[in-house]
Amino acid sequence: MLDEYPDIVIGCAGGGSNLGGLIAPFMQDKLLGKADPRIIAVEPASCPSFTRGKYAYDFCDTGHVTPLARMYTLGNGFMPAANHAGGLRYHCMSPILSKLYHDGYMEAVSAKQTDVFEAATLFAKVETILPAPESSHAIRGAIDEALKCKETGEAKTILFGLTGTGYFDMSAYEAYHNGTMTNHVPTDEELQIGFDTLPVQPE
């Protein structure tokens, strides 16, 4: 394979399983001081647990069966708006990834649905691979970082996770191309409804 080590590692983020698997070897190097790649999570703007959530103890499920875990969460009662990246519609983030983000070892950004599909369409035209909507969040992040490099004249190796194809998501691509796709970004008031469902912790 390529004899390259990434300067930037980018993955899509919903609950964190895919992202965790992608970044694990690079995060190990970072924690051991062997390398210092930037690690970036890209999540949907409609379900922004990293970028707008709270670092708090919460249930991982809506049935309140799981043990409480400290993580970035929108509250177990938060109901994300419907979007075409169903695999990223989850109210909270992996406790391990949450700790890494909280301690400054990784970054997070959010992306609107139409911006994600713009990136997905470009990728499909250039690489002849139709990416899954979830993967397309990472593609959006990779394109944005590449454009920054173009502006600054820097040469950086960017690794992103392409986790699946979008052949079962043709209706989503159709909605993007015919202009009916919408973006939902929750208001602070909508987020507060979810935060109000966080379990109360004793002092």
Regions found by a protein language model. Name each.
Residues C12, L22-D29, F123-V126, E145:
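Generic, well-ordered alpha-helical scaffold segments in large soluble proteins
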Residues I10, L19-M27, I39, E174:
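Short, well-ordered alpha-helical packing segments
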Residues L2-L19, T157-L162:
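A short, small-residue-rich loop immediately preceding and capping a beta-strand
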Residues D7, H102, A108-A111, G153-L162:
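Short alpha-helical "patches" and their helix-cap loops
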Residues A124-T163:
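C-terminal structured "cap/appendage" subdomains that terminate the fold
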Residues C12-I23, S49-T51, S135-I143, Y167-M170:
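Short glycine/serine/threonine-rich phosphate/pyrophosphate-binding segments
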Residues R38, L159-A172, Y176-H177:
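C-terminal, active-site-flanking charged/polar segments
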Residues M1-E4, Q28-D36, I40-I129, P133, ...:
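Active-site/ligand-binding loops adjacent to catalytic centers
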